[in-house]
Protein backbone atom coordinates (compact mmCIF):
# COMPACT_ATOMS: atom_id res chain seq x y z
CA UNK A 1 0.00 0.00 0.00
CA UNK A 2 1.13 3.52 -0.82
CA UNK A 3 -0.08 6.67 0.96
CA UNK A 4 -0.51 10.20 -0.38
CA UNK A 5 2.36 11.30 1.87
CA UNK A 6 4.58 8.73 0.12
CA UNK A 7 3.33 9.98 -3.26
CA UNK A 8 4.25 13.51 -2.17
CA UNK A 9 7.77 12.38 -1.24
CA UNK A 10 8.18 10.54 -4.57
CA UNK A 11 6.95 13.57 -6.52
CA UNK A 12 9.24 15.91 -4.57
CA UNK A 13 12.24 13.89 -5.78
CA UNK A 14 11.54 15.10 -9.33
CA UNK A 15 12.86 18.51 -10.46
CA UNK A 16 10.77 21.67 -10.17
CA UNK A 17 7.69 19.95 -8.72
CA UNK A 18 5.12 22.08 -6.96
CA UNK A 19 2.51 20.59 -4.65
CA UNK A 20 -0.79 22.39 -4.53
CA UNK A 21 -4.53 21.89 -4.59
CA UNK A 22 -6.92 21.20 -7.43
CA UNK A 23 -10.65 21.08 -6.66
CA UNK A 24 -9.70 20.87 -2.97
CA UNK A 25 -7.46 17.82 -3.43
CA UNK A 26 -3.69 17.41 -3.45
CA UNK A 27 -2.02 17.80 -6.83
CA UNK A 28 1.56 17.79 -8.12
CA UNK A 29 2.66 19.83 -11.11
CA UNK A 30 5.69 20.86 -13.14
CA UNK A 31 5.77 24.14 -15.07
CA UNK A 32 2.14 24.71 -14.14
CA UNK A 33 0.93 21.38 -15.56
CA UNK A 34 -0.54 18.82 -13.17
CA UNK A 35 0.96 15.38 -13.67
CA UNK A 36 -0.63 13.68 -10.64
CA UNK A 37 -3.56 14.44 -8.38
CA UNK A 38 -5.78 12.93 -5.74
CA UNK A 39 -8.95 11.79 -7.53
CA UNK A 40 -11.87 10.80 -5.31
CA UNK A 41 -14.91 9.46 -7.14
CA UNK A 42 -17.76 11.85 -7.84
CA UNK A 43 -21.39 10.80 -7.40
CA UNK A 44 -21.59 10.39 -11.19
CA UNK A 45 -18.51 8.13 -11.14
CA UNK A 46 -20.11 5.97 -8.43
CA UNK A 47 -23.36 5.70 -10.41
CA UNK A 48 -21.45 4.52 -13.48
CA UNK A 49 -20.16 1.52 -11.53
CA UNK A 50 -23.76 0.30 -11.30
CA UNK A 51 -23.89 -2.92 -9.28
CA UNK A 52 -20.09 -3.32 -9.34
CA UNK A 53 -18.13 -2.25 -6.28
CA UNK A 54 -15.92 0.79 -7.00
CA UNK A 55 -12.24 0.54 -6.08
CA UNK A 56 -11.86 1.51 -2.42
CA UNK A 57 -9.37 3.69 -0.64
CA UNK A 58 -7.32 6.60 -1.89
CA UNK A 59 -7.18 7.02 -5.67
CA UNK A 60 -4.35 8.80 -7.49
CA UNK A 61 -4.63 10.03 -11.09
CA UNK A 62 -1.40 10.18 -13.10
CA UNK A 63 -0.89 11.67 -16.57
CA UNK A 64 0.69 9.50 -19.25
CA UNK A 65 2.28 10.47 -22.57
CA UNK A 66 -0.59 9.29 -24.76
CA UNK A 67 -3.42 6.76 -25.02
CA UNK A 68 -1.01 4.00 -26.10
CA UNK A 69 1.00 4.55 -22.93
CA UNK A 70 -2.25 4.49 -20.96
CA UNK A 71 -3.15 1.06 -22.36
CA UNK A 72 0.36 -0.22 -21.64
CA UNK A 73 0.22 1.02 -18.03
CA UNK A 74 -3.21 -0.54 -17.49
CA UNK A 75 -2.01 -3.88 -18.90
CA UNK A 76 1.21 -3.85 -16.86
CA UNK A 77 -0.45 -3.18 -13.48
CA UNK A 78 -4.04 -4.50 -13.69
CA UNK A 79 -4.46 -4.96 -9.92
CA UNK A 80 -3.67 -1.35 -9.01
CA UNK A 81 -4.06 0.69 -12.23
CA UNK A 82 -7.48 1.25 -13.79
CA UNK A 83 -9.61 3.78 -15.61
CA UNK A 84 -13.21 4.97 -15.55
CA UNK A 85 -15.54 6.27 -18.29
CA UNK A 86 -14.80 9.87 -17.25
CA UNK A 87 -11.19 9.29 -18.39
CA UNK A 88 -12.10 7.77 -21.78
CA UNK A 89 -9.94 9.44 -24.42
CA UNK A 90 -7.82 11.16 -21.76
CA UNK A 91 -4.14 10.29 -21.29
CA UNK A 92 -4.18 9.42 -17.59
CA UNK A 93 -4.54 6.35 -15.40
CA UNK A 94 -5.99 5.91 -11.94
CA UNK A 95 -4.12 4.07 -9.20
CA UNK A 96 -5.82 2.37 -6.28
CA UNK A 97 -3.12 3.10 -3.71
CA UNK A 98 -4.24 0.33 -1.34
CA UNK A 99 -3.29 -2.20 -4.04
CA UNK A 100 -0.08 -0.54 -5.21
CA UNK A 101 3.49 -1.18 -4.20
CA UNK A 102 5.94 1.74 -4.31
CA UNK A 103 7.74 0.91 -7.56
CA UNK A 104 4.86 1.14 -10.09
CA UNK A 105 3.54 4.49 -8.79
CA UNK A 106 7.09 5.89 -8.65
CA UNK A 107 7.67 4.88 -12.29
CA UNK A 108 4.25 6.21 -13.32
CA UNK A 109 4.89 9.52 -11.51
CA UNK A 110 8.19 9.87 -13.35
CA UNK A 111 6.49 9.11 -16.67
CA UNK A 112 3.71 11.60 -15.85
CA UNK A 113 6.29 14.21 -14.93
CA UNK A 114 8.12 13.60 -18.23
CA UNK A 115 4.83 13.99 -20.13
CA UNK A 116 4.26 17.42 -18.57
CA UNK A 117 7.77 18.82 -18.05
CA UNK A 118 9.22 21.38 -20.46
CA UNK A 119 11.41 19.61 -23.05
CA UNK A 120 14.65 21.16 -21.79
CA UNK A 121 13.98 20.09 -18.20
CA UNK A 122 12.96 16.58 -19.28
CA UNK A 123 16.11 16.25 -21.39
CA UNK A 124 18.31 17.36 -18.47
CA UNK A 125 16.56 14.90 -16.16
CA UNK A 126 17.00 11.99 -18.58
CA UNK A 127 20.69 12.86 -19.06
CA UNK A 128 21.42 12.28 -15.36
Region spans (language model):
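Charge-dense, helix-prone N-terminal extensions
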Residues: 1-128
Amino acid sequence: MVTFDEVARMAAELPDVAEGRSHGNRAWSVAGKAFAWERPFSKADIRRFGDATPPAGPILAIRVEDLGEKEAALAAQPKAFFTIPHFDGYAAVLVQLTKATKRPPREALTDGWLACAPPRLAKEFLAR
